[in-house]
Amino acid sequence: MDLILSAVLVLGAIALIAALVLFGVSKKFAVEEDPRLGQVGELLPGANCGGCGFAGCSGMAAALVKGADAGSIDGLMCPVGGADVMGKVADLLGLAVANTEAKVAVVRCNGSCEHRPRIAEYDGLHTCAAMNSCGAGETGCGFGCLGCGDCVAACQFGAISINPETGLPEVDEEKCAGCGACAKACPRHIIELRKKGPKGRRVYVQCVNHDKGAVAKKACSVACIGCGKCQKVCKFDAIIIEDNVAYVDFNKCRMCTKCVDECPTGALVKVNFPVKKKEE
């Protein structure tokens, strides 16, 4: 009995000493967390979408606190929370936030069944990534939308759906958070984040086909053929022609829409503009 009691006392003493040592070490080498990390984290939406460029909201919070210590959080933006959340974060950190314009996902392909006829049938895993790895897909265009919906699966906000009539993804601007997850999921990079623009108006080229004009037009009737007519009519140098396809720089575009009227194939589109009344 005495032997058992002695063993218990010895083990208890060892456990107590070990606990005291561990407590002392933890106090000595403890890394104190900046309380601002938790405060900023509570302001962020918690979507962990990665649209800010970090793995999640905790990474964004750390970057914001680090930026605050450096005196600026310019260049950091939470696309889900938008200007409201960034304003609250800036107030918390005692900084001024740059006026960052909201962005929305746009689908730069108009190759519906009507404009881009199917010439083959794909019989494999129903994902854009899998189909893209096999070649051009079911049409003659090796650049256009594959229509399997990888972008739809990637969207956490239900902002994208495949139109059953056109076979193309459509973005619900009211739901789109501008996180860019859909753009990352698209193997052909036809989805782009663009500034929403004043009153939601935008002008852009709805095509990414880099083939020469005749080849592109044969594959899709509304393809950009790189003719340069839009570039010539633009007075603001907002359009560039690179690798046989036009691109509108939204930082320079003044949305006069002359380029849209000049485009011979309809590859240039304008969104959310008022419908012009026909002259009687």
Label every PLM stretch briefly.
Residues 229, 239-241, 245-247:
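Strongly charged, low-complexity linkers/loops
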Residues 257:
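Basic, amphipathic alpha-helical segments enriched in Lys/Arg and hydrophobic/aromatic residues
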Residues 2-233, 262, 266-280:
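Ferredoxin-type iron-sulfur electron-transfer modules and their immediate structural context
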